[in-house]
């Protein structure tokens, strides 16, 4: 097949552009084009000394026609190749055993047969038909198979489209559930963060107000102690005086000493005591609720994990482990409080507790949510690190429920860690 195509390509190069047949006695004229000697001679018969090339229309000399031996040899080689090709094809269509042309096809053996083979005992009882008839029969079978396969192709395309649709529906559901989980846990994280900020801000406010009350208490009692000390000093001085001087104004001094009374103000206002008691009660309630919720969530998660991993094979577990590892690395830098590009960490709102109104902390909105001024949105870490005195911090540490603080912090940490395990979009 390949050699036949090669011969045909070569034959195209030795075609006379006048007679459109293989060059016979090829000659070349001045412009370089090749023609049959007979064809180009007929063109030049009507002219005197010059004639125009049939291809490029260039004027060439009539007596400049010259034989092209190389082209003649090429034509001979091509003709020899063509003869060999024809002989090869003829040989292929000839029975190698009897040297006769093939005319029949044996259905039983799938072989071509000549007249002699057809009558031989090897094929006489077989289903034998003419080559053209057998080919026509198989053409029909081929056409039937084409139609069957085309119908299967059509059905396969439909099945594939349905499968792709199911995959799309599945991935859409997965994405929806992922966004649902992220949204719900983000809301939970926000609620816990707001609750934590409020509780810490309230307890710090109580500590701050208690410290201010202590300062007021000291400011009220210190002058009285100074007055008492002066009275004692004056009596001691009188006691060491001579009799005459001792008796001078003695009644006034004694009367003043007897009339002295220590005015003891309330160290901590009852309103602050009440608010602290309410805060502690709220802290106990939250701690208990969080513990119950945490225990239930952990128990349910354990059951869910067991169901999820039970049907996984080794490859599934491997892909799961890689996914967890990659997601953890990807999301670690996006956790709240992680380092930014400049090496600084994200902090909460600044602490401006000195300008906080005394009772605006406990206003309630129409939606039932507790509202509080931005100046009180300070975390414990911010309070202890932004200019609070040692007395302020000590009072705050005593008032704050360590159990509540630990519970809230544990939940916020757990939620952030959970975010790192959820694949991102």
Swiss-Prot record:
Up-regulated in gastric adenocarcinomas. InterPro entries: TRIM/RBCC, Znf_B-box, Znf_B-box_chordata, Znf_RING, Znf_RING/FYVE/PHD, Znf_RING_CS. Signal peptide: none annotated. GO terms for biological process: antiviral innate immune response; defense response to virus; host-mediated suppression of symbiont invasion; inflammatory response; innate immune response; negative regulation of NLRP3 inflammasome complex assembly; negative regulation of viral transcription; positive regulation of DNA-binding transcription factor activity. Keywords: Antiviral defense, Coiled coil, Cytoplasm, Immunity, Inflammatory response, Innate immunity, Metal-binding, Mitochondrion, Transferase, Ubl conjugation, Ubl conjugation pathway, Zinc, Zinc-finger. Changing residue 16 to A: Abolished E3 ubiquitin-protein ligase activity and ability to ubiquitinate NLRP3. Residues 336-360 have a biased composition (Low complexity). Pathway: Protein modification; protein ubiquitination. Auto-ubiquitinated (in vitro). It catalyses: S-ubiquitinyl-[E2 ubiquitin-conjugating enzyme]-L-cysteine + [acceptor protein]-L-lysine = [E2 ubiquitin-conjugating enzyme]-L-cysteine + N(6)-ubiquitinyl-[acceptor protein]-L-lysine. It holds the Pfam family zf-B_box. Residues 328-360 are annotated as: Disordered. GO terms for molecular function: transcription coactivator activity; ubiquitin protein ligase activity; zinc ion binding. Zn(2+) binds at residues 95, 98, 117, 123. Its EC number is 2.3.2.27. SMART domains: BBOX (SM00336), RING (SM00184). GO terms for cellular component: cytoplasm; cytosol; mitochondrion. Residues 126-162, 270-307 form a coiled coil. A zinc finger (B box-type) spans 90-131. It is found in: Cytoplasm; Mitochondrion. The keyword Electron transport does not apply. PANTHER family: E3 UBIQUITIN-PROTEIN LIGASE TRIM. May form oligomers. Interacts with isoform p52shc of SHC1. E3 ubiquitin-protein ligase that acts as a regulator of antiviral immune response and inflammation by mediating ubiquitination of substrates. Acts as a regulator of innate immune defense against viruses by mediating 'Lys-63'-linked ubiquitination of MAVS, promoting MAVS polymerization and formation of three-stranded helical filaments on mitochondria. Acts as a negative regulator of the NLRP3 inflammasome by catalyzing 'Lys-48'-linked ubiquitination of NLRP3, leading to its degradation. Regulator of Src-induced anchorage independent cell growth. This is E3 ubiquitin-protein ligase TRIM31. It comes from Homo sapiens (Human).
């Amino acid at each position: 097949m390949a050699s036949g195509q090669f011969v045909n390509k070569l034959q195209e190069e030795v075609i006379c552009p006048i007679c459109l047949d293989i060059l016979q006695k090829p000659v070349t004229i001045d412009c370089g084009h090749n023609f049959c000697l007979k064809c180009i001679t007929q063109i030049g018969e009507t002219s005197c000394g010059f004639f125009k090339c049939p291809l490029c229309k260039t004027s060439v000399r009539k007596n400049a026609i010259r034989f092209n031996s190389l082209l003649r040899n090429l034509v001979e080689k091509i003709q020899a190749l063509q003869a060999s090709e024809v002989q090869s094809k003829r040989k292929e269509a000839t029975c190698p055993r009897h040297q006769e042309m093939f005319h029949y096809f044996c259905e039983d053996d799938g072989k071509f047969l000549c007249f002699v083979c057809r009558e031989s005992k090897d094929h006489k009882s077989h289903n034998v038909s003419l080559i053209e008839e057998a080919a026509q029969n198989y053409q029909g079978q081929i056409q039937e198979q084409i139609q069957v396969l085309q119908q299967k192709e059509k059905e396969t395309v439909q099945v594939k489209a349905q499968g792709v649709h199911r995959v799309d529906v599945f991935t859409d559901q997965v994405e929806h559930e992922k966004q649902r989980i992220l949204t719900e846990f983000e809301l939970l994280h926000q609620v816990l963060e707001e609750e934590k900020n409020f509780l810490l801000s309230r307890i710090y406010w109580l500590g701050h107000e208690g410290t201010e009350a202590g300062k007021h208490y000291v400011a009220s009692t210190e002058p009285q102690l100074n007055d008492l000390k002066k009275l004692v000093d004056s009596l001691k001085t009188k006691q060491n005086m001579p009799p005459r001087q001792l008796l001078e104004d003695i009644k006034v001094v004694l009367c003043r000493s007897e009339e002295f009374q220590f005015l003891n103000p309330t160290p901590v206002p009852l309103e602050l005591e009440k608010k602290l008691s309410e805060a502690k009660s709220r802290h106990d309630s939250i701690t208990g609720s969080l513990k119950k919720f945490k225990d239930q969530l952990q128990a349910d998660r354990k059951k869910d994990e067991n169901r999820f991993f039970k049907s996984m094979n080794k490859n599934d577990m491997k892909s799961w482990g890689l996914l967890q590892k990659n997601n953890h690395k990807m999301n670690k830098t996006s956790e709240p409080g992680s380092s930014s590009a400049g090496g600084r960490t994200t902090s909460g709102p600044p602490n401006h507790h000195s300008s906080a109104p005394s009772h605006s902390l406990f206003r309630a909105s129409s939606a039932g949510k507790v509202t509080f001024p931005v100046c009180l949105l300070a975390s414990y870490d911010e309070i202890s690190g932004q200019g609070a005195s040692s007395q302020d911090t000590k009072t705050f540490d005593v008032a704050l429920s360590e159990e509540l603080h630990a519970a809230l912090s544990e939940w916020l940490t757990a939620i952030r860690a959970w975010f790192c395990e959820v694949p991102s979009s």
